[in-house]
């Protein structure tokens, strides 16, 4: 992994797998909690009913009104979108 940020992998049935490099932050706003994931964040797994914003130098992507599952481990954030 490069020292610039984290790697984000987004998978959904419509677009398949999309990968983003050098991401600075992943902001999760779910019905029960808010979470901001950055480089070297602890390992975490969970479910999202809400939105995810992915921001970096070359990327600014938002997923709104989704139901998804996520896992963050060793500076790789995986997002599996169900709806």
What are these regions (language model features)?
Residues 1-7, 11:
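N-terminal export/targeting signal detector
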Residues 9-83:
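Compact, glycine-rich, soluble single-domain proteins
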């Amino acid at each position: 992994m490069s020292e610039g940020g984290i790697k984000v992998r987004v998978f959904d049935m419509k677009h398949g797998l999309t990968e983003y490099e050098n991401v600075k932050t992943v902001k999760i706003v779910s019905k029960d909690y808010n979470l901001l994931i950055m480089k070297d964040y602890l390992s975490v797994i969970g479910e999202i009913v809400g939105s995810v914003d992915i921001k970096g130098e070359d990327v600014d992507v938002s997923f709104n009104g989704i139901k998804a599952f996520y896992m963050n481990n060793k500076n790789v954030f995986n997002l599996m979108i169900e709806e």
